[in-house]
Amino acid sequence: MMDIYVCLKRPSWMVDNKRMRTASNFQWLLSTFILLYLMNQVNSQKKGAPHDLKCVTNNLQVWNCSWKAPSGTGRGTDYEVCIENRSRSCYQLEKTSIKIPALSHGDYEITINSLHDFGSSTSKFTLNEQNVSLIPDTPEILNLSADFSTSTLYLKWNDRGSVFPHRSNVIWEIKVLRKESMELVKLVTHNTTLNGKDTLHHWSWASDMPLECAIHFVEIRCYIDNLHFSGLEEWSDWSPVKNISWIPDSQTKVFPQDKVILVGSDITFCCVSQEKVLSALIGHTNCPLIHLDGENVAIKIRNISVSASSGTNVVFTTEDNIFGTVIFAGYPPDTPQQLNCETHDLKEIICSWNPGRVTALVGPRATSYTLVESFSGKYVRLKRAEAPTNESYQLLFQMLPNQEIYNFTLNAHNPLGRSQSTILVNITEKVYPHTPTSFKVKDINSTAVKLSWHLPGNFAKINFLCEIEIKKSNSVQEQRNVTIKGVENSSYLVALDKLNPYTLYTFRIRCSTETFWKWSKWSNKKQHLTTEASPSKGPDTWREWSSDGKNLIIYWKPLPINEANGKILSYNVSCSSDEETQSLSEIPDPQHKAEIRLDKNDYIISVVAKNSVGSSPPSKIASMEIPNDDLKIEQVVGMGKGILLTWHYDPNMTCDYVIKWCNSSRSEPCLMDWRKVPSNSTETVIESDEFRPGIRYNFFLYGCRNQGYQLLRSMIGYIEELAPIVAPNFTVEDTSADSILVKWEDIPVEELRGFLRGYLFYFGKGERDTSKMRVLESGRSDIKVKNITDISQKTLRIADLQGKTSYHLVLRAYTDGGVGPEKSMYVVTKENSVGLIIAILIPVAVAVIVGVVTSILCYRKREWIKETFYPDIPNPENCKALQFQKSVCEGSSALKTLEMNPCTPNNVEVLETRSAFPKIEDTEIISPVAERPEDRSDAEPENHVVVSYCPPIIEEEIPNPAADEAGGTAQVIYIDVQSMYQPQAKPEEEQENDPVGGAGYKPQMHLPINSTVEDIAAEEDLDKTAGYRPQANVNTWNLVSPDSPRSIDSNSEIVSFGSPCSINSRQFLIPPKDEDSPKSNGGGWSFTNFFQNKPND
């Protein structure tokens, strides 16, 4: 090899030198190089040399070195291998490998000389342990087996550790393959140690898939880690493959069968079938299929839940068949809890425990228990179905002679696992006795009895502590503890004393050991009545004098059971004085009263109770009662069920105090009960089952002296006050316009139910059928309340009321226990007559005063009133007849009323008063209203009669009245006032003397009708009396024109005359100015006369 290296280096050196010298001729150099290389190759093929030396070891003792032969050599090549070490050694070989002993640390020169037909060649190598590889021999599987029930593979092989000089660590790599396609399922490592000898190794693996489902393959290899070897360490080759396959031997097609697994685990089921599987179910759930070899399939279940007690079905369905199995998912046994061992009779030990969590496995898969006693090595087993939750298990273990301490171990096992619990006990301290039986009671005397019972077991070595329960009727139970020594025959006896004679007792008993572990259960109850004895005390006595004071009544109370000591048959009553002793015949029970006729001497009364055994000591009481003049009745109130009575200490009281009480409604002598209190006491609480709330009781406190009893205090009271049950009965005694006097009666004591504290009187306005006063305590401002705290007051006057008003009155009584019901009444106050008179007089007086003042004012202002409201000359502007519509008057030229146009009246109608002048016979004043036909009045109710007025022109004579009428005539409203203002007729004498004195209204002229020429004097008189003067000469007027409507048509509604007139008055529109003109004497009444001034007024 070194020669080859030299040969290769030489041409390179020559080429390099030639290149340096002849760099100019590149082509020539290249050709020369190729030629020399080819020559060198041919030369090398001819000579050759060994190369690629490689050394390995598989046991660290021998190195197996090999190299590659020179090229072109054949089988006839020999090799000489020389190793340069402390002593040169050479080996002649005909092959390319050599086994040499392992060399120590350091570098070694290896020379390999090859001898062949072409010659020889030599190669030198440097060999060191670091260039050596440690490759273990290929391992061999000795055995591969399977447990198909558990789907477990078991592997066995030999590590050949005897060939290794040193202790080494070995890593084994195990590969598990599945199916014919050899899919990798598991690759694990297994560590062992080489210890200088051949060792068999075992490895097992539980498949997640039943081994029946598919073929499984296993192969292994190893890796040796030696601390003393510095070379390269490599894996060995894989061992030959071993396989496991299932050979069908039954009709079973689904695996695994009846598998028990842990809840929450994953499991694979498979179906080995020649038919195609269509579906798979676990319970009611479909599962996806996993295809294996052929038609075999599998399903994977993850995190399986707890199954029912009968298991969970797994079903595979093919076209023609159904195959299946059952799976049981549960838990391993829990550690036994509350393990306890005790004994009832020191013959058997009972160990009990709580199994803890339910495993959900029953039947053959249920948990089995084994109780092992380690000192003796004995054990007992329990195998049973799974217990319900919280149920305790028990195992009986027979006690061993002369052994008191036991060490128990309780083992629990089921297909999923194991658990255990231990306990160490001294059994004599863990005794839980049986329930005592055959419990009996027998009399010893009236105050002692004997108890006997049976307790199974041999307790001769221990002592018992027994508790006896003693209970009397209506009394607190009593416990007594007794210690007794244990016996072998199980019969026990004990005596009880300090009992009461003639008393019904109830007994029961339970026992425990003196060291105490547990009480036994109580025995059955046993009732027993003790025997009688003489009464231990005399009866409690009291006496009362009869109402006539001649007989003394003696009372006594029945003796309580604890003092009677038996059934009382009779009583002996006797009375004695300094002079004599008097005894009564025996008084049979249950009579507790006797009456003796005594005089006023002092006697001592004795009462003795007797039963079948003997008599009681006598009870004595004095008959004399010491008077007490300074005695007041007091009030007391109880507190709940009793009443507290107190008094001052009195050293004169030598014996005791007696408190007597009774219902106050009972007749004399009053006695319900009594109580005696020691003489050094100053208070007591009286309680009785007969006390009732709201009932008044009388209490009497007596003090005892040698010579008799003295009444110290007299009290009335209630155990509890209540509100009255009835309302006070009240009436109205008197009623006035502003007050009401009411009076009420006392409430009976039985209905009062407490001490009366006052009355509440409500009053307010209200009617009988209204609800205004229904709620009395609502705080209404219109309801007044009077609180009457003086209970002696029986009347009340309510003042400041309104007259003729209805009032609602309510009266209620109250105690400290509450307010009683109400009694109501409605009362109406009387009417106030003074007020009525005043109410009438005041308006009348006001009216009179107003009238007088008005009259005085009117009289003083009569001139102003006349001028203002009714002047002598009315203002035409105020005349209603002249108030025309402005628009009509201004907008029409046909209206010519009061216009100064020349016209000649056709006819004049004169309205005048009666006078001395002759009347015009053929001239009449026509009232248009009166003469209007009824049908026209209905058709035109608002039409007015219009008369024409036109002041004549003196200078001009109108020849043609018709033309004037045709030209238009002014019209004036005319009203007939003749009947309204007709004056009273005067005697003819007065008429002759004053022909015009009664005229009220005068027309513009007054002309005689019969003669056109009158006496001048008469004419002057007429002029003087006339109230209105026409503006023109009256002599020129035509009174009646031949062409007037009146002369033409007597039924015409149009009446015309020359002078205007007022339609609302009969006075002259223009009165005379001279003072000498005669004045109207008021021949007729008119409104103006009311305002005329009288000169004599």
UniProtKB/Swiss-Prot annotation:
Q: Where is this motif: Box 1 motif?
A: 869-877
Q: Which InterPro entries match?
A: FN3_dom (IPR003961), FN3_sf (IPR036116), Hematopoietin_rcpt_Gp130_CS (IPR003529), Ig-like_fold (IPR013783), LIF-R-like_Ig-like (IPR048497), LIFR_D2 (IPR040817), LIFR_N (IPR040901), Type-I_Cytokine_Rcpt (IPR050379)
Care to name a GO molecular-function term for this sequence?
cytokine binding
Q: Which GO terms describe its cellular component?
A: external side of plasma membrane; extracellular exosome; plasma membrane; receptor complex
Where are stretches of biased composition, namely Polar residues? 1086-1097
Give the recorded effect for residue 1068 to L. Answer: In a colorectal cancer sample; somatic mutation
Question: What positions are modified (Phosphoserine)?
Answer: 927, 1044
Residues listed as glycosylation sites in the UniProt record: 64, 85, 131, 143, 191, 243, 303, 390, 407, 426, 445, 481, 489, 572, 652, 663, 680, 729, 787
What's written under domain?
Answer: The WSXWS motif appears to be necessary for proper protein folding and thereby efficient intracellular transport and cell-surface receptor binding.
From the Swiss-Prot or TrEMBL record, give the protein name.
Leukemia inhibitory factor receptor
Q: Which organism is it from?
A: Homo sapiens (Human)
